């Protein structure tokens, strides 16, 4: 269950580090909120006896040097005393990403300030993470045989670290670690969920949920639909979608939707869009942000973008598709 006001967190995990000390990843199998009294803030390397006590007897064999990848896997304990403060290092960021994907915290409830500057560009391979700057696929294949490179990025696939209960993810490449997928969520092949974003209840995701975006229960993000984030382009609107909403195929929004709203297929509503109301007045879409029960559509005769009170129903989610 998501903690709406988390304060601190602790976890033991396995980190992949280079000879220069660069942290490529840290896997925390069982993160938890709250910090034991007297716990030392930051990340501490665990000794052989501590590994069994904190991670379990099966994890000791995973601590090793891997010459083929040029890395060492070490056991660590990370303590974050204040989740409202910005992350201080790479381990700190990785624990926060795990907290989100384990659904221990909800998107936007903890600080993720400065995460890009603390993460390393990594080649994510079937043999494990490799530093992108020194990656040599020929050397790796010579040592290990066939190796698949899934991508080169600072964020890995969520499914390689966390598989939340009660969800379907048709294509693991489309969901980043740090995504928050509520039980009953289905992410289809063309859906995408960024870190510090996601769903709060059963949802159909066939479009893009950008960083910082939260989608309420029983909402449908249609195929090719786009929800604007704030990572680039100067956007300042923090977008959320309420419960029971439909964002139609190839539609898009740069404003928040309240509950029970519909955006017609192919209709894009940015914060600065001029919207005609039923009384003939025209307002910026930002003035309608977060309101319940609206239908946004493009008038097929005049071409004007309109907002009307909702009537009827869009059909709602198919319960059989979300019994995961």
Curated annotation (Swiss-Prot):
Record-linked CDD domains: LbH_THP_succinylT_putative (cd04649)
Annotated Mg(2+) 2 binding sites: 190
Enzyme class: transferase
Pfam families from the UniProt entry: Hexapep_2 (PF14602), THDPS_M (PF14789)
Record's GO cellular component terms: cytoplasm
Binding residues for succinyl-CoA: 208, 223, 226, 249, 264-265, 272, 284, 297-300
Active site: 206 (acyl-anhydride intermediate)
Main location: cytoplasm
Function: Catalyzes the conversion of the cyclic tetrahydrodipicolinate (THDP) into the acyclic N-succinyl-L-2-amino-6-oxopimelate using succinyl-CoA.
Family of the protein in this entry: Belongs to the type 2 tetrahydrodipicolinate N-succinyltransferase family.
NCBIfam families: DapD_actino
Assembly, per entry: Homotrimer.
Name this protein carries in UniProt: 2,3,4,5-tetrahydropyridine-2,6-dicarboxylate N-succinyltransferase
């Amino acid at each position: 269950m998501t903690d709406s006001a988390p304060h601190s967190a602790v976890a033991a995990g396995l980190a992949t580090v280079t000879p220069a000390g660069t942290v490529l990843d840290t896997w925390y199998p069982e993160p938890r909120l709250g910090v034991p009294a007297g716990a030392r803030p930051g990340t501490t390397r665990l000794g052989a006896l501590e590994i069994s006590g904190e991670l379990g007897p099966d994890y000791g064999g995973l601590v090793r040097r891997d010459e083929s990848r040029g890395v060492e896997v070490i056991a660590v304990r990370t303590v974050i005393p204040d989740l409202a403060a910005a992350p201080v290092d790479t381990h700190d960021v990785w624990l926060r990403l795990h907290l989100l994907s384990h659904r221990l915290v909800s998107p936007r409830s903890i600080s993720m300030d400065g995460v890009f500057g603390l993460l390393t560009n990594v080649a994510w391979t079937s043999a494990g993470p490799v530093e992108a700057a020194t990656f040599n696929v020929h050397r790796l294949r010579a040592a290990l045989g066939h190796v698949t490179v899934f991508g080169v990025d600072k964020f890995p696939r969520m499914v390689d670290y966390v598989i939340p209960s009660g969800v379907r993810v048709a294509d693991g490449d489309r969901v980043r670690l740090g995504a928050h997928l509520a039980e009953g969520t289905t992410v289809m092949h063309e859906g995408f969920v960024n870190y510090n974003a996601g769903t709060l209840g059963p949802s159909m995701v066939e479009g893009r949920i950008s960083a910082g975006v939260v989608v309420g229960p029983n909402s449908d993000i249609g195929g090719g639909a786009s929800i604007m984030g704030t990572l680039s382009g100067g956007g300042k609107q923090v977008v959320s979608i309420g419960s029971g909403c439909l964002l139609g195929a190839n539609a898009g929004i740069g404003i928040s939707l309240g509950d029970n709203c519909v955006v017609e297929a192919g209709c894009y509503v940015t914060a600065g869009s001029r919207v005609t109301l039923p009384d003939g007045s025209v307002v910026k879409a930002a003035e309608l942000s977060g309101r319940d029960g609206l239908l946004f559509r493009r008038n097929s005769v005049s071409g004007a973008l309109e907002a009307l009170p909702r009537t009827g129903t869009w059909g709602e989610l198919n319960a059989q598709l979300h019994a995961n």
